[in-house]
């Protein structure tokens, strides 16, 4: 989030459709086994993660997601700065929730920051995921080329900070 001031009301949509991606079915997904730091010169093959925010660790590391079927996710670019509530309203409550297994599946296709559906220019790619207690959170991932890994953060969907233009949001 970038602290962009509140804009004047507009009839322009917040989201511009970019595309869809297929996410394979996932077995039971144990978050603390997958979302682990793995970056720098000693990085092992696989997804490189350089940072997990304190909120992410508190809200998600103890979570286990049950098996999920194959899914198609949509992603869209923000055309103007937006709050989570504004993004979620445009996505629609029935389509907003994704899973950490789905996020990780996307990261696995771009394990070292190569081009793909996730942004790799340090800008956030946003997902809405229920935490270990079922509370919906904004989970964002962005690539840090300096550290050679993904930054994974979590925020309250009630945050007063706006996501900047050009960020992307995923939904079902």
Map each language-model feature to its residues.
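A binding-site-centric feature that preferentially detects glycan-recognition modules on secreted/surface proteins
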Residues: 1-95, 102-172
């Amino acid at each position: 989030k970038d602290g962009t001031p509140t804009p004047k009301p507009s009839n322009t949509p917040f989201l511009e459709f970019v595309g869809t991606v297929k996410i394979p079915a996932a077995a039971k997904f144990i978050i603390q086994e997958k979302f682990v730091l793995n970056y720098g010169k000693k990085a092992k093959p696989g997804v490189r993660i350089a940072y997990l925010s304190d909120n992410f660790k508190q809200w998600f590391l103890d979570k286990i997601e049950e098996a999920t079927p194959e899914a198609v996710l949509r992603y869209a670019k923000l055309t103007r700065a937006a709050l989570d509530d504004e993004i979620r309203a445009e996505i629609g409550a029935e389509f907003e929730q994704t899973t950490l297994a789905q996020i990780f599946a996307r990261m696995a296709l771009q394990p070292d920051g190569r081009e793909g559906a996730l942004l790799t220019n340090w800008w956030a790619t946003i997902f809405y995921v229920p935490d270990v207690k079922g509370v919906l959170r904004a989970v964002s991932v962005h690539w840090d080329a300096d550290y050679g890994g993904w930054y994974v953060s979590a925020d309250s969907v009630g945050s007063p900070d706006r996501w900047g233009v050009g960020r992307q949001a995923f939904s079902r």
